[in-house]
């Protein structure tokens, strides 16, 4: 009788252990959808909207710094550009090798173009350049932090209002800068808008200019999944 009782206790303990192993990873994964990603990944996060890009170039002694991106309370960082998109994904703001990389602009475009694309890493480490973009899968975060400022080397400020945020898995037309699979420019932009997790009343036209921020998605982890945050130009000063 005693042996039978012990066997039952052991049996229950095994079930509890298996139950815990089964549900722990699910709970852990769900944390990634609760938007706990660090919103201060950039060192010395600025709280002002006036940036001196030339001083940033001097600070890092790197002429590849061509601008600055600032999202209040979210992101503050130089923008770098090389002859390839890959270089600054494995080099820091000084130009030294660093697997964390920097925020890099697509080599095909310039600040002020009809479409500018910025790339940066995200991952398990909290200080990766674009980890914070994964927070834009949360509607309240999306609505609260919807303005992007970009400064060029002359300190001209470009203001963008975010109108789309979504995770892309297979349609990578958004990186095209000249042709859009038969769509007009306006149709292309509305396609990006309609993919958004959250709806906005942003009106897009043939004259609209946009910025696209891309990083690897940390929500429901998987291969070839990119978090995109897209804004339309509203002001230049």
What annotation goes with each model-predicted range?
Residues 1-15:
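N-terminal Sec-pathway targeting helices
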Residues 12-24:
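N-terminal type II signal-anchor transmembrane helix
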Residues 21-237:
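Solvent-exposed, non-transmembrane regions of membrane-associated and secreted proteins
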């Amino acid at each position: 009788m005693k042996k039978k009782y012990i066997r039952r206790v052991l049996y229950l303990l095994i079930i509890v252990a298996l139950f815990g192993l089964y549900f722990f990873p699910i709970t852990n994964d769900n944390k990634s959808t609760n938007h706990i990603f660090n919103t201060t990944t950039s060192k010395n996060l600025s709280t002002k909207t006036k940036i001196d890009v030339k001083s940033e170039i001097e600070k890092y002694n790197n002429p590849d710094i061509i601008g600055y991106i600032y999202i209040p309370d979210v992101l503050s960082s130089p923008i770098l550009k090389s002859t390839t998109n890959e270089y600054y994904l494995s080099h820091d703001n000084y130009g030294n090798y660093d697997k964390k990389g920097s925020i890099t602009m697509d080599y095909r475009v310039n600040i002020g173009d009809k479409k500018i694309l910025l790339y940066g890493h995200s991952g398990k480490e909290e200080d990766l350049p674009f980890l914070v973009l994964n927070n834009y899968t949360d509607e309240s975060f999306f609505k609260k932090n919807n303005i992007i400022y970009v400064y060029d080397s002359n300190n001209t400020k470009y203001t963008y209002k975010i109108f789309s945020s979504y995770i892309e898995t297979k349609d990578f037309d958004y990186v095209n800068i000249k042709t859009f699979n038969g769509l007009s420019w306006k149709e292309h932009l509305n396609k990006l808008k309609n993919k958004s997790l959250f709806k906005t009343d942003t009106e897009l036209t043939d004259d609209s200019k946009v910025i696209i921020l891309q990083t690897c998605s940390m929500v429901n982890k998987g291969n070839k999944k990119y978090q995109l945050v897209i804004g339309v130009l509203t002001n230049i000063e």
